[in-house]
Amino acid sequence: MTAAPELRPKSWIDSIAPYIPGSSKTLDGRPAVKLSSNENPLGTSLKAKEAYREAIDSLSLYPDSGATALREAIGACYNLDPARIIHGTGSDEILHLAAGAYAGQDDEVLYPRYSFSVYPLAARRVGATPVEAPDDDYRCSVDALLKAVTPRTRVVFIANPNNPTGTWITRAEVEKLHNGLPRNCLLVIDQAYAEYLDPECDDGALALAKNTKNVLVTRTFSKIYGLAAERIGWAYACPEIIDALNRIRAPFNVTIAGQKAAVAALEDQAFIQNSFKHNKKWRGWFENQMALLSNAGIRVIPSSANFTLLLFEGSLTAETAYKALMDHGYTTRWLPGQRLPHALRITIGSEKHMQDVAGILTSLVRQAL
């Protein structure tokens, strides 16, 4: 007698490595300073915290599924039409929605090497083929992306600034990429770290989305706004794209407390400016300290985000540095799972944290010589 077939997941799931979040504990289980998830070291705006607390009496209620007040606040802050804004459970949800709405079986989803790990996952979830274009020394190569476009390409993802490298491409490069894509291809510009860019480095993505029919720009409240726990993202595009994504978006996907906290966070631009200044100062200081170790094989990839990527190309390995920092109570992001076993991504933390990490790495380099 033939055995009954067993329940099995789709075959492509076996090829997906489970996501490993940044650790908040050392290898032996001790609490650690977490410099592995690119969270805001200044925490959260006091105004956002107060708005969150005030939402406690609404726990029995469903949230506004359209997040009207939040979309209006985003529109006011960024000078955008609220009707062309969609909200999500983090920007991750919107990235998945974009792939689901515009790609599928026999289609291709294109992205640069060394970019956000969600992009290939979003492609596979909808049966599309993920296609990786070569980078240019840890930076997105527009020419390589355009060369990789085929008649099957339906979605192109880029992160600007990029994660995990921290590099960015210019407005002219973004425009070149868009101009080189067919009109039936959706360009998704993931701007999770855009608020850390100097104003003169604006890549023009929101303006491009405002004036075109095939550009989607995503942003998040998890980074500079300090609301990572609430998982709130948003995106901007033409009405047709927003309508398509809203049709497949889960209802009630952002909590009442999260919506209220995000509105308050947008209104507290003093906190945002303080976060920006702190990050710029200590990222610059840390990168300068690490540049002093270049003769020992430590290479700094200049960052425009709230983290720095270090390449270990000498006798000191990234794995050794990762474990040593753990021993000193600091968790960072070692990246063998992203084919960067020679790299550490280090979140910009407090003044003390950055001084400690710089001192530890300097001592390790001297010991390895």
From Swiss-Prot:
InterPro entries: Aminotransferase_I/II_large (IPR004839), HisP_aminotrans (IPR005861), HistidinolP_aminotransfase (IPR050106), PyrdxlP-dep_Trfase (IPR015424), PyrdxlP-dep_Trfase_major (IPR015421), PyrdxlP-dep_Trfase_small (IPR015422). Optimum pH is 8.0. Catalyzes the conversion of imidazole acetol phosphate to histidinol phosphate. Can also transaminate aromatic amino acids and histidine in addition to histidinol phosphate. PANTHER family: HISTIDINOL-PHOSPHATE AMINOTRANSFERASE (PTHR43643:SF3), HISTIDINOL-PHOSPHATE AMINOTRANSFERASE 2 (PTHR43643). This is Histidinol-phosphate aminotransferase. The modification N6-(pyridoxal phosphate)lysine is found at residue 223. It comes from Zymomonas mobilis subsp. mobilis (strain ATCC 31821 / ZM4 / CP4). Pathway: Amino-acid biosynthesis; L-histidine biosynthesis; L-histidine from 5-phospho-alpha-D-ribose 1-diphosphate: step 7/9. It catalyses: L-histidinol phosphate + 2-oxoglutarate = 3-(imidazol-4-yl)-2-oxopropyl phosphate + L-glutamate.
